[in-house]
Amino acid sequence: MKVLLINGSSKEGCTYTALSEVARSLNEEGIETEIINLGPNAVRDCVGCGMCAKNGNARCIFDDDIVNRIIEKAEEADGFVFGTPVYYAHPTGRILSVLDRAFYAGKKVFQLKPGACIASARRGGTTASFDVLNKYFTISQMPVVSSTYWNIVHGNTPEETKQDLEGMQTMYNLGKNMAWLLKCIKTGKENGINLPENKVQRTNFIR
């Protein structure tokens, strides 16, 4: 089993430190992990062209940034952790652009796989950012993995983040909970408990 962790920061700093603690915890449980750093490179916004739906190949028509690479890796992953630093009480524009396009083009790649998000800040805005990222999971039938507190850490440097003992413990516990859920899903499949097949009904309120 494998968990894909996405660092929505341009640096390997505080958010990376928190994600690394989640990964360490998962590795202890025999879960393979991979951390992808979005880095400083530009990421396109979704332009609503609809070509991904028309092509039906779970890929974005724009293939000049990291989004399709993430979708490809997501196909092989069993769970996900998305991390973001806080910019003006909000996730980074970079990770939102990635998730908008990845979830729209490759929604079925993520469906019914466990997901979790974490937010890192010097001080405020973590819970608002945390709520925004969770929206991607809850519209995609993804079990949301929680911890012993909201998945947030505080600090302005990696060293300060490590001093947030409760925050780092929350990251470690998140990894344990993710591993437990992945093992439950695997055991269920092995014993004939199949994933649900749900119908979708759409209603437009303005006609």
PLM regions and their residue ranges:
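N-terminal beta1-alpha1-beta2 submodule of the flavodoxin-like/Rossmannoid cofactor-binding fold
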Residues: 1-105, 161-207
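A short beta-to-alpha transition loop/helix N-cap that caps and shapes the active-site region
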Residues: 42-45, 124-126, 157
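Short, glycine-/small-residue-rich phosphate/pyrophosphate-handling segment
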Residues: 93-94, 104-152, 165-170
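Short alpha-helical linear motifs
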Residues: 119, 137-139, 156-157, 174, ...
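Internal, active-site/partner-interface "lid" segment
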Residues: 151-160
